[in-house]
A protein has these predicted regions:
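Flexible, acidic glycine-rich loops studded with aromatic residues
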Residues: 57-73, 78-222
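Disordered, acidic Ser/Thr/Pro-rich linker "stalks" and the adjacent N-terminal cap
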Residues: 217-285
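Short, contiguous acidic/charged loop-to-helix segments that flank catalytic cores in large enzymes
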Residues: 34-35, 158, 162, 267-270
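Active-site neighborhood of glycoside hydrolase catalytic domains
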Residues: 1-71, 78-81, 85-86
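Hydrophobic alpha-helix feature that most strongly marks membrane-spanning transmembrane helices
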Residues: 2, 52, 89, 176-179, ...
Length: 286
């Protein structure tokens, strides 16, 4: 395999069993490791030594930061940008691929109009809006951001034709994001070129998303709604889920209605057994 970089994964390791595994605990004791994060880091360090000895470089998902990053590792940041930012600030290379902008297995238009997908909502314009180099980085740190990557996980993609449909034209937007300075980007210009690119791809036999007939954002989400409860205090008798907090205690009375999925930060979720139980204090009789 000719690649200089070898992606070793390193994400979503379930460490709970390691805390009671006799062999894991023995290894931690022998290597003077304080916790299971350091045990994972110990393994990643060993894998890197093996790869480096064979002229290769280690690349892994941002969880490889846990317990201490291997000396020469490159981080691929998927759980947001924080992992990549932490990596470059410590002198390591990073590739940005946050799910919010780069996971092409998400719906690209109104879900009711699309083939079944894993979830989410990532239209072309949102992909194009991404900037992989955070404004919080210094010039030197920014140079360690080596680029961006699109990901397409195939649990809901049964055929090559479906794969093409999910990729095109969003991968064109991500490519332009990666090679363009932010100040040179123009969404109207790119959108026009993307429409032409889709026609060209279809003429060559590719199965692309029908950009010309894109539905776009949920109409209700495009403008606030005014009602008597806007701005009023909400008393939560059952808490909202920490996984779906939206904008916290102001969400239900902010007058903002959500887009197609909760990922826009406007949908608040209640998954407790008692579900939704709130009181809205109107401040006066209504």
């Amino acid at each position: 395999f000719p690649s200089e970089y070898i992606h070793i994964g390193g994400d979503e390791a379930g460490k709970r069993a390691w805390k009671t595994c006799p062999k894991c605990q023995k290894r931690m004791q022998d290597e003077h490791l304080s916790n299971v994060d350091e045990l994972q880091s110990y393994l990643i360090h060993r894998v890197e030594l093996f790869l480096n000895a064979h002229g290769r470089k280690l690349l892994g998902w941002d969880e490889i930061l846990q317990g201490g990053l291997a000396p020469n590792a490159t981080v691929m940041s998927w759980r947001g940008e924080e992992g990549g930012i932490a990596a470059v600030r410590s002198g390591h290379q990073a590739i940005m691929t946050p799910g919010k902008y780069c996971y092409l297995d998400s719906y690209q238009d109104a879900p009711y109009s699309q083939p079944e997908a894993i979830g989410g909502y990532l239209p072309l314009e949102k992909v194009y809006s991404y900037n992989p180099v955070s404004d919080s980085l210094t010039v030197e740190q920014a140079e360690l951001v080596y680029g961006a990557q699109g990901n397409l996980w195939a649990e809901y993609i049964p055929t090559p034709e479906h794969m093409e449909y999910m990729i095109y034209p969003r991968i064109l937007a991500l490519a332009e994001v990666a090679w363009s300075a932010p100040e040179r980007k123009s969404w109207p210009d790119f959108h026009n070129r993307a429409l032409k690119a889709v026609d060209d791809l279809q003429a060559k036999g590719y199965h692309t998303f029908d950009l010309k007939n894109e539905i776009g954002s949920r109409p209700e989400s495009l403008k606030p709604i005014n009602h008597l409860a806007v701005g009023k205090k909400v008393i939560y008798n059952t808490p909202y889920s920490p996984h779906y907090p939206a904008q916290g205690n102001t969400t239900l009375t902010d007058g903002i209605r959500g887009d197609w999925t909760y990922g826009d930060g406007s949908w608040q979720g209640f998954i407790d057994k008692k579900r939704l139980d709130v009181i809205i204090d109107m401040g006066a009789k209504t």
